[in-house]
Each structure stands twice: as structure tokens, then as C-alpha cells.
């Protein structure tokens, strides 16, 4: 799996925590209109139009369960701690999987040849047509780490403040982070607006027990959804 904290690369929407329901509807608005010069007593010749695209997202309940017996606990009390740690790791891995599955769906695409370098990142950013590049990040897999580190711009960049967990430095002024979840020969350039984590319920842990069998259950549970909500804010770069 990966040690990357994917939550820091997403927008987190907790609106559903304050409202009843399991669905979140998002409208993307498009305004078309132009300012006209008008003569005295005359009206504009065309009216502006506002349209919107509606997308509905339904959160999911996700949980897992592990069991241990009283006898196991008496033999080794660490079984409970180890089980809780394993369950927490499993929850994080599930979130990371959802994030990388969603960001890979972006329809904004670019390519590179040989090794990933500064120019490839610049070309990918250009496809996003951004005025403000604040918040951009680059995600690579471990095998590409050496390629990035050999890039002249990367070597010349500052290696100071670490903005994201897993970050190895900057390229073109953009933080570069490494994850095993990034597919081979693939690079993602994105902002947090690309993928949204809709949270209905934070992770909670419920316990149960079958008394006459001395079987204890630990059930971690979360309610939410990870979705690609703005494909224009993520570029998928693949090797040509």
C-alpha cells in the first residue's frame, strides 16, 4: 500500500454532517453574456444566459469487522492493539484507493517520452488553463523518483518546507509527492479541487460481544464518498 495521506490532496466536504440525507447535489454554472454599449433610450440586443450542470453524489457506508476471543486476549493482550492498528490502516488504505481510482478518471490528458521532466510538467499545467497555480501538486510513483531527481529544475529548486506528507521536493515550483498507488509510467498534476471527499460520518468504532462464546467484535465504520468532481483540475500524464 502507500504511506501517503491522500486526504491532504482532496477537498473535504462535510456539509452532509449538518443535514439529513445521503446525497449531495452539486451545480456547475456557466454564464454567457457580453457587455454592450447602448444608445440613449435603447436596450441591450442580447440577454445573458446562465446554465448549469447538475451532478448527484450518494455517500456509502463502509465498514469492516475483526474478532478476537477472550482466550486469545488472555494469551496475548496485544491482539487487541494489533487488531485496532490493522483496522485503522485498512481504513486509510481504502481511502487512498478511492482517491487514486477517482483522480485516474480525469479526461484531461498529456504524454511524455523517456523520463518525466520539467517541460512535461509545464505542458500538463498549460492544459489546465489556470490563472492561479497556487495549490498545484505532482504525484509520481517510486520508480519515477530517480527520474525527477535528475531533472535540472528539480535539483535547482528549494528543498525546504515540506508541504505534503510524502513530498520529496519541488519541480517548477510545484511540490512533488511519491506514492506506490500511482500507476507505472503515470504522473498526476492536480489541485485539491479535482477530487472531493464527501463526509457524512467520520470513522467510528463499534464493539459487540457474543457472551456465551466469549467472542469480541470490533467494527470500524465510515460514511462518505470520494469522487472526481472537477476533471479540469487534474491532468493525467502517461508515457507515450
Regions found by a protein language model. Name each.
Residues 1-9, 13, 181-183, 189-193, ...:
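Protruding loop/beta-arch "assembly-hinge" segments enriched in small, turn-prone residues
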Residues 22-24, 64, 134-136, 172-174, ...:
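Structural beta-strand/beta-sheet cores of well-ordered domains, especially the beta-sheet scaffolds
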Residues 63, 67-131, 236-240:
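Alpha-helical scaffold segments that mediate packing/assembly in large oligomeric complexes
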Residues 41-75:
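Long, hydrophobic/aromatic-enriched structural stretches that serve as scaffold segments
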Residues 1-52, 194-202, 211-213:
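N-terminal "assembly arms/tails" that initiate or stabilize quaternary assembly
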Residues 70, 140-142, 222:
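Short, structured patches in soluble enzyme cores that scaffold and shape functional sites
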Amino acid at each position: 500500500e502507500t504511506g501517503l495521506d491522500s486526504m491532504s490532496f482532496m477537498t473535504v466536504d462535510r456539509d452532509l454532517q449538518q443535514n439529513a440525507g445521503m446525497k449531495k447535489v452539486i451545480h456547475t454554472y456557466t454564464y454567457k453574456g457580453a457587455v454592450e454599449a447602448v444608445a440613449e433610450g435603447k436596450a441591450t440586443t442580447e440577454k445573458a444566459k446562465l446554465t448549469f450542470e447538475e451532478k448527484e453524489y450518494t455517500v456509502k457506508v463502509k465498514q469492516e469487522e475483526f474478532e478476537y476471543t477472550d482466550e486469545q486476549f488472555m494469551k496475548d493482550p496485544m491482539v487487541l492493539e494489533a487488531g485496532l492498528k490493522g483496522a485503522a490502516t485498512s481504513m486509510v488504505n481504502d481511502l487512498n484507493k478511492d482517491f487514486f481510482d477517482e483522480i485516474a478518471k480525469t479526461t484531461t490528458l498529456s504524454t511524455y517520452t523517456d523520463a518525466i521532466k520539467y517541460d512535461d510538467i509545464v505542458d500538463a499545467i498549460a492544459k489546465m488553463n489556470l490563472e492561479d497555480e497556487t495549490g498545484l501538486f505532482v504525484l509520481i510513483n517510486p520508480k519515477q523518483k530517480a527520474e525527477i531527481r535528475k531533472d535540472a529544475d528539480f535539483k535547482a529548486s528549494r528543498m525546504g518546507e515540506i508541504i505534503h506528507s510524502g513530498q520529496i521536493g519541488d519541480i517548477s515550483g510545484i511540490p512533488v509527492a511519491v506514492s506506490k498507488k500511482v500507476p507505472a509510467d503515470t504522473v498526476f498534476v492536480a489541485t485539491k479541487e479535482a477530487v472531493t471527499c464527501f463526509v457524512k460520518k467520520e470513522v467510528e468504532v463499534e464493539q459487540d460481544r457474543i457472551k456465551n462464546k466469549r467472542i469480541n467484535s470490533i467494527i470500524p465504520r465510515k460514511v462518505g464518498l470520494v469522487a472526481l468532481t472537477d476533471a479540469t483540475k487534474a491532468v493525467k500524464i502517461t508515457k507515450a
